[in-house]
Amino acid sequence: MSLAITRETLASHISDYAVIYDRDYCLWIETMMQLLREGKFSEIDIPNLLEELDDISGSQRDALESNLEIILMHLLKYLCQPQLRSRSWVLTIFEHRNRLKKAFRRSPSLQKHYQEIFPECYQTAKKMASITTGRLLSDFPEISPFSQEQVLSIDYLPD
C-alpha cells in the first residue's frame, strides 16, 4: 500500500482545496493549474491563490530593490575607493544591472516601482557601503550622485 498522496486521492477525499494547500503545497499548485486549464473556476481556492499571487508580486519587487541596492553600494565603493577598484566590483555591478534589465523586460510595470523606490534604496546602499568600507555615513553623498539612468546603463562607471 502506497502512502504517497496524489492529486486524485486528495481530490476524491477532500473537497476543500485549502486543506491540500496546507498539506502539500506543490500538489496544491499542480491542482490549481489543472483546474484552471480545465475551466473549473468555481473549484479554485481563491483566497490562497490570491495570497500566492500577492507573494509573487512582492517577491519581484523585493528582488528589484535588492539588486538596486547592490548596484548602488558597489557604485559608491567604486566612486569613494578608487585605489581598491576591482574587476569583481565591476562584475557585480554588471550582473545586478543585467538582472534588473531582465526583470524590466519580463515585467515592464516594475520600472515605476524602480523610480519610486530609488531614493530609499540609495539610503540603504549608503549604509551598506559605510559598513563594508569602514567609512562614516557622512562620507557619502546625502542623495544619489548617480542618476537612475546611469545606474541601469551597462557601461556606466563613476570616474
Residues of each region from the PLM?
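Surface/interface-facing alpha-helical segments and adjacent flexible terminal/loop regions used
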Residues: M1-D159
